Amino acid sequence: MALPVQAAPQRAQVRRTAQFHPSVWGDYFIKNAPDNKMVSIWKEQAKVLEEEVRRMIISETQKPSGKLKLIDVIQRLGIAYHFEEEIGEVIEQVYSNYDDDEDLYDIALRFRLLRQQGYNVSSDVFDKFKDCKGDFKKHLVNDVQGLLSLHEASYMSVQGEKILDEALEFTKTHLMATQLSSPLPDQVSHALRWPVRRGLPRKEAWQYFSIYQQDREHIEPLLKLAKLDFNIVQKLHHKDMSIITRWWIDLDFTTKLSFARDRVIECSFWALGVFYEPQFVFARQVLSKAVAILSVMDDIYDVHGTIEELELFTEVVERWDISMKDQLPDYMKWYFEALIDFYAEIEAETTKGGRSFCIHYAKEAVKKQVRAYITEARWFNNDYVPTLEEYISNAVISSTYPILITLSFCGMGKFASKDVFDWLFTEPNKLLYTASGLARLIDDIRSHEFEQERGHVASAVECYMKQHSVSKQEAYNELNSIVVNMWKDLNEELLKETGVLPKPILACILNIVRVMDVVYKDEDSYTNSRNSLKDILATFLVNPVPV
């Protein structure tokens, strides 16, 4: 049912306040320039090791199962981007020459790697591991490596794959109950908390270094290459952060819009997580600035703006007319000027690259964004709590996921053609809808309590509680169940679009959801960035890996 905005009673016009804590990082990345003396030496060493690893991948003497294990390690160590062509060829060969005479570890690994690569292989391959009663065979509980491999594979499931649902429960139960000798306890506990499918590649690489190093069969040149590469890329990212910090300081939002979260480095975590590879330097720059700009917009709508100011601001953005800025209050004027300048920067860079079409889609995305935000502002102003379905239909936009994807594509050069943008804006778009809804629910489950304390539109939690007259815990249970199913839908849609969209585009879509899963795993670590996210960023940007 449509919301009767005008008929509903309205709140008194009082500005809310959130009292966000100040920046953790300040101008750290400007004042602490990295020592790049070792980078040239690291690059020379890495170049030699890279060729050695390449020879391992294409070796004719290694069995397919051995190559798959090697590829899995390469991907987990975060260096697969150096060997995409070779990995693709091996995966295609393995897909074309299936060998059923393998153990649980190998079959589950093969299944996962093929699905990760976009091959829609059948989960029936796991039927052989069930007994006549339809249960997984009891002897499998003693095969810890096999259980781990099956556990990881189960997260590649799509709707209707009952055997993978059963595999997940079976492996969880027995992995949690099993006492293991080193290094498997670390690997097991990490897999239970961060399965490969949901882990952020750059973060997972750092955490896998110690696990792989404890493996008695680890390949030393491979491990050394991964560590060198991590440190080389870290120096590049440090430089990115100094540029972004300078841009942020020049905007002076901490003074002009002091009510907003000062989180520019935390905003850059999205970019570092999605585009850690060196080649995507412009994409990182665009996405870092986009998250920072949109975070302030979110606080304008959710924290500071009155409904009258927000209605006017929405109209100004929808018209995209800089001459209207003088109608806005000063804080909105400053913000709108920064938004216009950011878009002008994108337009200039994409036009130079022969992609002037990008800016049209970017503008359409921000207009959709303010329409979604003003809808929520009206709901809050009128004390209206929508049904979950009505909420989600708007929240997939207000989540910022669609605009972040759009702006990310602007920075991706040749991979994001006009056809890709046309696909993105085609409705219905189940892949975009699923990823956006998933991002929104992950956020809501962890952040809604703090938001409600300061005054905020009803989240998915409050909407579900009111609609179904249930407790908060019951709402959590149901929404977490929806999240599980949306991950399955996301897996299915990514499989469908493989071959239609370039792999970097699909990786971008997946990685933004993964970032949300990291940021909101236990709490809203973006808003409260003094804890886990600070440590992750220090790992990404400050602390080199001992080689």
From Swiss-Prot:
Positions annotated to bind Mg(2+) 3: 451
Note: Does not produce any detectable product when tested in vitro.
Cofactor names: Mg(2+)
The species this protein was found in: Ricinus communis (Castor bean)
Keywords for this protein: Lyase, Magnesium, Metal-binding
Positions with a binding annotation for Mg(2+) 1: 298, 302
Residues that hold Mg(2+) 2 according to the record: 298, 302
GO-annotated molecular function: magnesium ion binding; terpene synthase activity
InterPro entries: Isoprenoid_synthase_dom_sf, Terpene_cyclase-like_1_C, Terpene_cyclase_plant_C1, Terpene_synth_N, Terpene_synth_N_sf, Terpene_synthase-like, Terpene_synthase_metal-bd, Terpenoid_cyclase/PrenylTrfase
Cofactor binding summary note: Binds 3 Mg(2+) ions per subunit.
Gene name tied to this protein: TPS3
Family of this protein: Belongs to the terpene synthase family.
Free-text domain note: The Asp-Asp-Xaa-Xaa-Asp/Glu (DDXXD/E) motif is important for the catalytic activity, presumably through binding to Mg(2+).
Chain ranges for the short sequence motif DDXXD motif as given in the UniProt record: 298-302
Single GO BP term: diterpenoid biosynthetic process
Protein name in UniProt: Probable terpene synthase 3
UniProt cross-references to SUPFAM superfamilies, sorted A to Z: Terpenoid cyclases/Protein prenyltransferases (SSF48239), Terpenoid synthases (SSF48576)
EC numbers on record: 4.2.3.-
